[in-house]
Amino acid sequence: MSGRTILYCLPIAECLFGALATLALFVTPASAEPPKQADARNKPLEVAVFEKLLAKHRDLTYDELTAKLKQRSYLDKLSFDPTQAPSFDLVAKKMQLTKEERGIFARNAFVSIDQNRRHTFASAYYQIYTGDLPVLVTSDSILHAMHRSYDDILLELETTLFTWTIDQILADSHQALAEKASANKDAALAANYRDVDLYLTVARNLLAGAGAPEKATDQPNDVWPGGLLVPSRLEMDKEVLAILKHVQSLKLQFPKRTPPTEIYGGTRYLDYSQFKPRGHYTKTTELKRYFRCLMWLGRIDCGWNVLPTDGTPGIESDSDRELRDAVLLCELLQATGSLKPLKALDDIIAFMIGRSDNLSVFALRNAMKDGNVKALADVKEAKALQRVQTGIRNSKQAQQMIRSQVVISDPDDPYYKVPPPATFQLFGQRFIIDSFVLAHVVFDDIIFKKKKQERMMPRGLDVLAALGNNVAVPLLADDLRKFNYSANLLASREFVDLHKPEFWKANLYNLWLDSLRSLHEDMTEHKRFPETMRTKAWQMKQLQTQLGSWAELRHDTILYAKQSYTAGILCEYPAGYVEPYPEFYGRVKYFAEEAGRRFEAADYSIRNEKLASQLKVIKQHQVSFFKTMAESLSSLQTLAGKELKGEPFTAAEKTFIKKTIDMRGGGSGPPRYDGWYCNLFYRRPECAKWDPIIADVHTDPTNNRCLEVGVGDVNFVVIAIDNDKDRGVYVGPVYSYYEFHQPAEHRLTDQDWQKLISTGKVPARPDWVKVFQAPARERKP
């Protein structure tokens, strides 16, 4: 028995979740045999490119990293006293600025104010409106509207088209399986029928409500007392029930702590805590069930390993058997006519989020075609199976770019990084570039001077640094020096920069990230850019904007994205200014235009007459909404461009800003918000709904914790703007961003997070926001 220590790790870009997890635990190995090296033949091109970039920067230090970064010429001081700017006294009085808030404003010419009230972006705009204050149209507010609309559209599709289609595909495939199994006379293939029966029966039970808590824990109630809701067709009830009980437990299986799951003739450790519904999936019982079902159909460790794992520690599988399982499922999908609706559904998810980071049904079918294989019976013999395996290897579409299950890595072996297995899933998790970044700035990807660095938890700042925000890098200095991952961070940035415009336009997720990238464009040399916005403090505020929007993006895609494990009222604002980022508004406009085109072209056909009629109306609403959104963004882009050119606004453009928001009396009912800002919300009547969100984006089981990122109450920014010789003070709404550690067994839902905010129990904001953020005010009753 060797005395060395092995580090179990899951740099889990968790398949359907908001939690890229690098899971680690020290244990004693059973054998001192050196691990086999990864098969380079299976590596995706992206991984090979990243590794070359990483090798180029081997052993890079933090000081060497910062020396390579382009430095900006930030303004050290302003040419005017912001407290003497016209309208400051009015704004200070109306906003009741505290001594500390005045101090930060005097120093930076802007300050972020937390009134400790349950403000939304719409209600914040309305407070500015009712206070007769000059309005600042913020990038934060535009991004938040984009989040709300994206999330609502996804939810709408899930509760109509997606749920019905998946239910039908599973039911049809299960029936066909039973028929084929009864006709099978080959005992050697019986295990494959049982494996696929297990896979389908678990999925159907989860969609029917199995796996829910035994007792009601929150609203809406979703309870499962036990027992199968859909029976196995091949006497696999016991095995199915065992997995459903694991799902109900929400426990993380881990070496030396728990036994693994016996599945598909082998064993593996599954993180069942990831089956806890989060994001918008807690809103209805049906969504909770859909969440669990898609988790099963998407998590890599629930799928089939289709190429040999070469004895990868932590995984025991028969890849020949599991590849036959996948071939059988493809055969069933073909026989039942399920490929067309499956492809239509996959295409919608692909243009909203991205492509699968695993072997998909369609990629496997291509390999089967190349190997002259149509059915399970065709791969009974080893030679036929090998032809399919060769096709899979040649396609390089099976090897994951982000590892997503429990494996074991030796911290003392600097030459071996555990490769992610080649895995098949029906609705596999999607590759997203920010998860790729997070997966490469943690153990076991960091090697410095021939020693693996045990950095178990990434930070949101890693993503922004890789996306090109230089302000984020010094904020990571402590981590970079302690864990020596400067080479990984620089390689990640260069990897991101290598992607051509087509990549950023490939899907709505990438378009969203690309919009965020435009907010750290260097405008310090632009003489018409407001002096206040040419300071480092302002760029820190924009960093918060980016992180807040990124948290909303990860929240919205938590199930699909692969993650690394309100008075004397005037009816207008007296004056207004738009944050002068024309490129940002242009990219969001393109997001809206492209979304409109993609949704119009999407296949919503369904074998349900009532739903088909409903989906026709839904599509018309989606296309019309994005057209209106694009028109508003076009106006903002024009206004921002004019500000930078020093051109005056037309009367119509002035009216546009003044009509950002309004609120009409509701008579005996509630008031109704109005204005172009409300038109940016897919569900317009809910534009002022209070909805702070939270998402766990990384898990560290060694310390039993996860990393949570979220946004809280909307804050106000008070800012002095010099627009040529015209100076004024404006007020606008901005994000409040939170990032903190939470016990892994208590991952937060939006409802949990909102309760913490309402009771004043939120954790501290990141230290770096203190540059522009005043302390939260006392809560007023």
Regions found by a protein language model. Give the residues of each.
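Boundary at the C-terminal end of the N-terminal hydrophobic targeting segment
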Residues: 30-32
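N-terminal secretory signal peptides that target proteins for export/translocation
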Residues: 1-10
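Short intrinsically disordered, low-complexity coil segments enriched in acidic
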Residues: 2-3, 25, 314-315
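Long, non-catalytic protein-protein interaction scaffolds
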Residues: 34-781
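Bacterial N-terminal signal peptides
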Residues: 10-26
